Amino acid sequence: GSEMCIRDSFTSLPSYLPTGSLMIFNNTKVIQARLHFRKETGALIEVFCLEPIEPNDYVLNFQQTEHAAWLCMIGNLKKWKEGTLKREMTVKEQPITLTATRGECHGTSHWVDFRWDNPEITFADILEVFGELPIPPYLNRDTQESDKETYQTVYSKIKGSVAAPTAGLHFTPRVLNALKEKGVDLEELTLHVGAGTFKPVKSAEIEGHEMHTEYISVSRGTIENLIAHNGKAIAVGTTSVRTLESLYHIGVTLLKNPNATEEELHVHQWQPYETAEETASITSVKALQAILDYLNRHDMEALHTSTQIIIAPGYDYKIVNTMVTNFHQPQSTLLLLVSAFVKGNWRNIYDFALNHDFRFLSYGDSSLLIP
């Protein structure tokens, strides 16, 4: 496309999108993932729940009573050498005692075992009452009551993220209705945003960066709708982009191995680049059809797997042809993803944003990218 940059208000978004196009949103919901404990010594320890370990299914874990284990980041770790953290609280008008025991270390995170003494209270109840919403650290402030509303998208449904898919924060019911009136089809999928999203690329070469893995789920209906739209879509947010592009590569795996297990469908970091030659001739519709066939064979309503895809310059986009995204910080994998999409144009776009006082990051302004 042309190198044009235009500044407009977000409410006029529908006027830039063609009737009959398909727009896809990530319906994940941010969980109140930060738990605070005070030791007898007075030290404050923060336990930040990143992903469920036991059980490792999000829904089942939230439904757990009396016991649940998570992979957690621990704040003030040096003060928690050993022993069990304890906190007493009232949940649903019942007094309970929650304990946390630290398990093995995984990189910068630890397994943490939570136990509580009331079989009627679920882990979801505990996070709801006792957890704090993890707003971005650079805001340099405590979480406020208003964040519970402003840091969730209006269409958030499926609990599991530790950060909001922030491109979606701009969408109000009014904008969503205007999109429908314009004849834009709206669909959803789920990617639970992990803390790894914020991990800066520290290596000079991208080969040195290990991408984080995130859980994804896409319903049969969304895949059928993608096929109906010729395998092309407008993605809202980098998380939707990564999920949609991962779908293509999952389809390619299934074309080669129709009996692949859920584990084998996981998209590895460099997989798209290693298979670039063979994928040159595989259309997105063909790849998506392979997923649909897989769901039909197994009588499944949705695809559940995980992705570690890293989208960087040199990546060949297969499904996403337009994206809505905020402005990202330097040294982020998000900026790599954008620059792979608009090719060398990202500098012009970011210069324009800086010169026109656009705001960056989570609570910042938005961009509609049409390469």
Where are these regions (language model features)?
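Surface-exposed, charge/polar-rich loops and edge strands
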Residues: 2-3, 7-371
